[in-house]
Each structure stands twice: as structure tokens, then as C-alpha cells.
């Protein structure tokens, strides 16, 4: 790959807007960007002298998530290339030393796909800056067109036309014709701009401004309270009684001046204006229609068993399965998608047989072996091992 192509690929991979644009449609396959980054990460780790285990994990991840015909998501690569890559990765996982050219067959088709997608993205984003933009309002009489004056777009179009129709201006007539053409173009653009400004001013004049033309807001709407309607039923009889007695408010200027509390009912009604009437909360035995229902435990709920797999120095992978079944090593491999020829050993946590420790790690390698359950869960750890001799196949 040339220096120019390398710079172009770096610009594509680091363009966050381009990545978001690819995610909008499945056909653009945004995973191709992530795959290309992962390949560069693999090569960088190889050059820096990372351990073989780290390279194997990364190669396994790239193959399973993007390249594999069964589980891969990067479908822009031809099936023949993906099959070749699967063969390469399996050879490395079976004991062959990792090498920096492992993913070279993927780089060229990925680069071509990213270049074509970025060309389409550049064209699309350039077309978004349209010179004309139609706008409409709620009222049919207020509909109009808003003109957006884009100097950059006009400048690009002018340069394009000039490059197609090159005028040498050698004679006086050619220069005069060019002068008239420029004046005609400028006058047309000026009229377009003036028309746009006129339409904008008309829209502002017709717009429904809540503050009016003089900048003052209209007075707020009156809030009329209906005290008797909003008053709870337990206060209704007491309210009517006080209204019939024509109670007058007394002087309340002093502290504890025996002021009438008749105003409190008015305030109570006003504060509850426009709110939902809630039932009496003084009686806990009443049925509240607005209360949150307490969750009821279903009697037929199926119990789950947690199955955990952890690679060395890696985060655990967890699965939930039905607890009413016996789990074999074959089902365990199928559950986590583990390849049959992987050079790894699975150790399962179980109760210590001699009682010298709280638990022990038991090695299981037969597909029909039943996995031990320790503390209501199955816990496994995977360790990478060198390939066994040809006359001993444990897995």
C-alpha cells in the first residue's frame, strides 16, 4: 500500500461522521471499518512483540465476529476470501505461530469497499448543501420558498463551467462577451438573494409572535377556581356550613390573633385546580386506583442456572440456562461456540475431594462428561496449551 493510500485509509478510519453515516444503512456495512481497525491492531501488536496468547485471542475474535461464514458480519468480502481466511486462522489456532501477514487477503477488498463508500459519502454530504430549500408552515396562506445563498456552491459550479468552456479572451469581442455574461450571472444571483430576503421578511411579519409587534406579551389567561367542585368530599359539608354562617375574616395582623381559617378552604381549592382528585389516604385499607401494583411472583417461573467461562486474564462470559438439565462438555462447547480443535483446556470449579481447600479445579475433556455445579453455578476457566502429539488427542 502506497503512502497516499495509507494516508487516505487513516483519514477514513478516523472519520467519525463517516462511520455514523455507514451505520444508517445495513448495506454499507459499518463493521468493515471496525474490521480494518482490528487488522491494524493485530499488526501493531505483532510488531510490538505482544505475547502469542494475546495475538491468538485477537485473531480468534476477528475471525468469529467478522470473517467466519457462519458468524461473521462483514459480508462485503467474497466467500472464497473468507474461506481462505478461516483456514489461515484455524492453522494458527491449531499450533502454527502467528505471523504479520495473517490477514493480508482481507486488506485489499476492505480498502476498495471503504474507498467506494467514502466517495459516495462525500458526494452525499456535498448534495445536502442545496441552493434551494422548500419550507412550509401550518397555514396554507403562509407557504413560501426560502432561498439559501451558498457562495461556495456557486463558486464551485462557476469553476466547473469555466473549466468546460474555456474562453481565451484574445479579441475585444471575446472580452466584451465575457463581461456581459458575468454581469448577467451576477444580476441573476443578486435578484435571487433579494427575493430570498424579501420572503424571509414576509414570513417574519406573518409569523405568530406571542409577544406581538411591540414586544409585549399578552396578559395571562384568568384562572377561575371552582372551590366546591375541587374540594374533597370529606370537606364538602364543612365548607357549606361555613358558607351558610357567612363567617368573616378577623384581624390577623398580630401573632395568634384568632383569625378565621375560612380562607384556607379557598386556598385549598385553588391549589388543587387542574389536578386529579386522589382518594383519601387516611384510610390505608381503601383501594387506591392510582397506586402502583405490587409485583406478584409467578408460581411457574423457571429457575435459571448460571454458566460462566473465563479465559486467562480476560473478562468472564456468562450464560443463563434452565436449571432442570444436566450440562455436558459437548453442550458447554456448543453454548459458547467453542471450536472442537481449539488447543485449550477447560477446568471446572468443584468441591475439593480431600477437603484441603474450599474448592478445586477439575479438568474435563470428554464430550459426555457432566459438568460439576459449585455454589449453584457452573464456573469454568480456559487455558491455552501447546498442541498435543499426534498420537494423543484429548479434545
Curated annotation (Swiss-Prot):
InterPro entries: DIX, DIX_dom_sf, RGS, RGS_sf, Ubiquitin-like_domsf. Residues 190-230 are annotated as: Disordered. GO terms for molecular function: protein kinase binding. Residues 4-132 form the RGS domain. Residues 301-386 form the DIX domain. Residues 194-208 have a biased composition (Basic and acidic residues). One of its GO terms (biological process) is cell development. Keywords: Developmental protein, Wnt signaling pathway. Works in parallel with pry-1 in negatively regulating bar-1 signaling in vulval precursor cells and Q neuroblasts. Shown to have a role in excretory cell development. Interacts with bar-1, dsh-2, gsk-3, and mig-5. This is Axin-like protein 1. It comes from Caenorhabditis briggsae. The lineage of its organism: Eukaryota, Metazoa, Ecdysozoa, Nematoda, Chromadorea.
Amino acid at each position: 500500500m502506497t503512502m497516499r493510500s495509507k494516508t487516505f485509509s487513516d483519514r477514513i478510519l478516523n472519520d467519525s461522521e463517516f462511520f455514523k453515516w455507514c451505520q444508517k444503512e445495513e448495506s454499507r456495512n459499518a463493521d468493515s471499518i471496525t474490521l480494518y481497525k482490528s487488522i491494524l491492531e493485530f499488526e501493531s501488536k505483532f510488531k510490538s512483540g505482544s505475547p502469542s496468547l494475546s495475538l491468538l485471542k485477537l485473531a480468534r475474535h476477528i475471525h468469529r465476529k467478522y470473517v467466519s461464514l457462519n458468524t461473521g458480519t462483514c459480508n462485503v468480502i467474497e466467500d472464497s476470501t473468507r474461506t481462505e481466511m478461516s483456514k489461515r486462522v484455524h492453522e494458527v489456532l491449531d499450533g502454527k505461530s502467528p505471523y504479520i501477514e495473517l490477514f493480508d487477503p482481507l486488506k485489499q477488498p476492505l480498502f476498495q469497499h471503504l474507498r467506494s463508500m467514502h466517495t459516495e459519502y462525500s458526494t452525499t454530504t456535498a448534495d445536502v448543501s442545496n441552493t434551494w430549500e422548500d419550507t412550509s408552515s401550518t397555514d396554507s396562506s403562509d407557504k413560501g420558498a426560502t432561498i439559501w445563498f451558498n457562495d461556495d456552491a456557486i463558486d464551485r459550479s462557476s469553476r466547473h463551467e469555466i473549466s468546460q468552456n474555456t474562453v481565451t479572451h484574445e479579441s475585444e469581442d471575446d472580452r466584451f462577451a465575457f463581461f456581459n455574461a458575468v454581469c448577467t450571472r451576477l444580476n441573476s444571483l443578486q435578484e435571487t438573494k433579494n427575493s430570498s430576503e424579501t420572503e424571509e421578511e414576509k414570513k417574519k411579519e406573518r409569523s405568530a409572535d406571542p409577544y406581538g409587534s411591540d414586544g409585549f406579551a399578552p396578559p395571562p389567561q384568568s384562572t377561575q377556581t371552582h372551590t366546591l367542585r375541587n374540594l374533597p368530599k370529606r370537606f364538602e359539608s364543612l365548607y357549606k356550613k361555613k358558607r351558610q354562617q357567612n363567617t368573616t375574616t378577623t384581624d390577623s395582623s398580630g401573632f395568634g390573633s384568632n383569625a378565621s381559617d375560612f380562607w384556607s378552604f379557598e386556598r385549598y381549592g385553588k391549589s388543587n385546580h387542574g389536578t386529579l382528585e386522589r382518594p383519601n389516604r387516611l384510610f390505608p385499607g381503601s383501594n387506591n386506583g392510582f397506586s402502583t401494583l405490587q409485583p406478584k411472583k409467578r408460581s411457574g417461573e423457571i429457575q435459571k442456572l448460571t454458566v460462566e467461562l473465563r479465559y486467562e486474564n480476560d473478562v468472564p462470559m456468562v450464560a443463563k440456562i434452565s436449571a432442570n438439565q444436566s450440562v455436558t462438555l459437548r453442550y458447554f462447547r456448543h453454548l459458547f461456540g467453542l471450536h472442537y480443535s481449539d488447543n485449550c483446556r477447560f477446568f471446572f470449579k468443584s468441591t475439593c475431594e480431600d477437603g484441603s481447600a474450599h474448592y478445586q479445579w477439575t479438568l474435563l475433556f470428554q464430550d459426555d462428561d457432566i459438568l460439576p455445579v459449585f455454589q449453584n453455578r457452573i464456573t469454568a476457566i480456559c487455558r491455552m496449551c501447546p498442541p498435543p502429539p499426534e498420537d494423543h488427542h484429548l479434545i
